């Protein structure tokens, strides 16, 4: 799909029992970490198998390549980060709208989880898409201090935060740029 002038990719998994169904189903979006790929995340998380037993549609959006870095990730932070023309929050908002209109998805049961850089993206979605995402599950990802100071969700948010105490890459206590 095109978002902000960029061709964006995602993988979708519809359980066998929902392919021909007209039942309204939840949507679970899962975000890969930095240097990651949606296809790997789809294989790694086990959400495909879980969706078969729990009757939800799983979607794995693909981040973009950061200019100068050469690796994939999510541009998180205040709305649309200053990283060129990429606006991942807008992409996810448009993706949710497209999926809800094309598939039998309950717009009130859209959930988001993500690992590491994907967890940072989850906090951005909590700040800016609280009207579209029902609950949030960041794993080993934090919120930028600047974002915390400017985060004004539309409602109280259900969030489950999972983080290891021995994480040296993204310490749970945060750093000078993240809390």
Predicted segments — roles?
Residues 27, 158-160:
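Protein kinase-like catalytic core scaffold
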Residues 169-173, 179:
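Conserved alpha/beta-hydrolase "acid-adjacent" motif
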Residues 3-14, 18-111, 121-124, 128, ...:
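Serine-hydrolase catalytic machinery in alpha/beta-hydrolase-like enzymes
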């Amino acid at each position: 799909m095109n978002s902000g002038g960029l061709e964006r990719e995602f993988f979708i998994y519809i359980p066998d029992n929902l392919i021909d169904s007209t039942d309204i189903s939840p949507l679970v979006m899962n975000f890969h970490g930095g240097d990651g790929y949606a296809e790997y995340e789809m294989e790694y998380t086990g959400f495909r198998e879980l969706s078969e037993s729990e009757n939800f549609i799983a979607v794995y959006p693909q981040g973009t390549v950061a200019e100068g870095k050469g690796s994939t990730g999510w541009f998180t932070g205040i709305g649309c980060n200053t990283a060129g023309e990429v606006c991942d929050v807008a992409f996810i908002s448009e993706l949710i709208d497209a999926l809800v209109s094309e598939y039998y998805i309950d717009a009130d049961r859209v959930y988001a989880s993500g690992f590491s850089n994907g967890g940072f993206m989850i906090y951005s979605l909590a700040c800016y898409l609280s009207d579209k995402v029902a609950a949030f599950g960041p794993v080993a990802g934090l919120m930028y201090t600047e974002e915390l100071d400017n985060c004004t969700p539309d409602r109280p948010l259900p969030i489950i935060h999972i983080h290891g105490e021995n994480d040296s890459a993204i310490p749970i206590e945060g750093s000078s740029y993240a809390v």
